[in-house]
From Swiss-Prot:
An annotated GO BP: glycerophosphodiester transmembrane transport
Annotated InterPro entries: AAA+_ATPase, ABC_transporter-like_ATP-bd, ABC_transporter-like_CS, ABC_transpr_MalK-like, ABC_transpr_MalK/UgpC-like, Mo/tungstate-bd_C_term_dom, NA-bd_OB-fold, OB_MalK-like
The protein, known as: sn-glycerol-3-phosphate import ATP-binding protein UgpC
Function: Part of the ABC transporter complex UgpBAEC involved in sn-glycerol-3-phosphate (G3P) import. Responsible for energy coupling to the transport system.
Length: 362
């Protein structure tokens, strides 16, 4: 196990194209960090620099307080699990898992001991003689993880390891990775674009945006107090509703196109009064037929136990997430107009109109 640190890490490609603009972060011994963000945000580049597959343009990466910028990947004592399993098709499961150890010339008895121990953890004991073509997608990914485990590295790196699996298998493998970390307690860095993976696996999340860590915190910290409109719109499914509003000195709120919101002034903090800001409301923290604003229903998504009601309020689209039982009590159809608003039990979110950052103190 080990600590992992980033000190003003930057990456620029040929042609002076910046990808990582300066990352500072400390990963504690045994911590599971998930880097999440949209395509092109720099999350995989950051991981590849840790692995030694990309050079660091500026700054330092430290493993156990040792700068590793110039070390070869094999010298960093890390193990990486990729999106593609990258198994040797002509080798058995045992030989795939043992290959890296054979290259390092470990004794045969030690190799067998490590492979069999990893196979027991991953429930691969009965599959060690099979070739990859005889395995399911989930089994192949477990073999790839086993190949990393047997190395007994200081740091595990996971680069979107579940992206090629179907939805049901992804859920199962998330649980496998969670149990694996609890058992091994190895420092881990996990990259994904899937916020569900990030929320369920992470001790702390790093939300990346345009090459910069936009917010670092526990999953609930990021969900409950997003640092910016980007984070608010990225974390959460459906994402947070964001309305451009003008707040009067008396706490009365109007949308940017002049629609009055029937919200109690008591719910409007002093820091935003007399200002133009962005107001955020989580879809699950809103109610149909509640005080707020009128919305014309444009679409209804039926998800079994839940309904997603999409409504238009002037130029803004708003989504309400409610139970099917609650929805059945509101005989609304596409084209109908009804009032929607906050449930009064959860605070509203407020962001600066110009920067998108969360209003200080809120």
């Amino acid at each position: 196990m080990a600590t992992l640190s980033f000190r003003n890490v930057k990456k620029t490609y040929a042609g002076n194209v910046p990808v990582i603009h300066g990352s500072d972060m400390d990963v504690a011994d045994g911590e599971f960090i998930v880097i999440v963000g949209p395509s092109g945000c720099g999350k995989s580049t950051l991981m590849r620099m840790v692995a030694g597959l990309e050079t660091v343009t500026e700054g330092e990466i430290l493993i156990d307080d040792k700068v590793v910028n110039t070390l070869e990947p094999a010298e960093r004592d890390i193990a990486m699990v990729f999106q593609n399993y990258a198994l040797y098709p002509h080798m058995s499961v045992f030989d795939n898992m043992a290959y890296g150890l054979k290259i390092r010339r470990l004794p045969k008895d030690e190799i067998r001991k490590r492979v069999e121990a990893a196979a027991q953890i991953l429930e691969l004991g009965k599959l060690l003689d099979r070739r990859p073509r005889a395995l399911s997608g989930g089994q192949r990914q477990r073999v790839a993880m086993g190949r990393a485990i047997v190395r007994e590295p200081k740091v595990f790196l996971f680069d979107e390891p579940l992206s090629n699996l179907d939805a049901k298998l992804r859920v199962a493998m998330r649980l496998e990775i969670l149990k694996l970390h609890r058992r091994l307690n190895t420092t881990s860095l996990y990259v994904t674009h899937d916020q569900v993976e990030a929320m369920t696996l992470a001790h702390r999340m790093v939300v990346m945006y345009q090459g910069v860590p936009e917010q670092i915190g526990t999953p609930m910290e990021v969900f409950e107090k997003p640092a910016s409109t980007f984070v608010a719109g990225f974390i959460g499914s459906p994402p947070m509703n964001l309305l451009e509003v003008a707040v009067g000195g008396d706490g009365i709120v109007h949308t940017s196109d002049g629609i009055a919101l029937d919200i109690s002034p008591l719910a409007v903090p002093q820091q935003v009064r007399g200002r133009k800001v962005v107001m955020g409301l989580r879809p699950e923290h809103m109610l149909l037929n509640a005080q707020g604003l009128a919305a014309e229903i444009e679409m209804i998504e039926t998800l079994g136990s839940e309904q997603l009601v999409h409504g238009r309020c002037g130029k803004h689209m708003v989504v309400v997430r409610c139970s099917t039982r609650q929805f059945s009590e509101t005989p609304a159809r596409v084209g109908d107009t009804l009032t929607i608003g906050p449930d009064g039990r959860h605070p509203l979110h407020w962001f600066e109109a110009d920067t998108g950052r969360r209003v200080e103190g809120l």
